[in-house]
Amino acid sequence: MKKLRLSILILAISAFFSQSFACTSILVTRKASKNGSTMITYAADSHTRYGDLYYLPGGVHKPGEMIQIFDYGDGRPLIQIPQVERTFTVIRNANEVGLGITETTFGGRAELESETPAIDYGSLIRLALQRASNAREAIKVM
């Protein structure tokens, strides 16, 4: 009983002081699932980000068109970048061709934060899903 109480106490303390505000992902490959499906889950475990399910319609875009990049956390405008000719429809962490991206991050060390950020991880995920049809293309986009 004493060991159980100690274990629970250690677990509680480590959860409080660890990077417990990181996001959680569960990945299942087709060889690991019973029916051959690939599955991903994503939970933004932060107390400030509650589940959202955004929809970004794909389409064909005009040459010279620009898109505004916003901070994923607070929504402030960051930079504008050129739009590509064709984008895929995105619903949260997956696109219309079946590419899915999830992440496990935490706030990070304060001294590494840029005072003039241009793009953040949430925007990178969205751009990759809009512009890539597979993981290799997504890496190139990022």
What label would you give each PLM region?
Residues 1-6:
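Positively charged n-region of N-terminal signal peptides that target proteins for export
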Residues 17-22:
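Sec/Tat signal peptide C-region and signal peptidase I cleavage site
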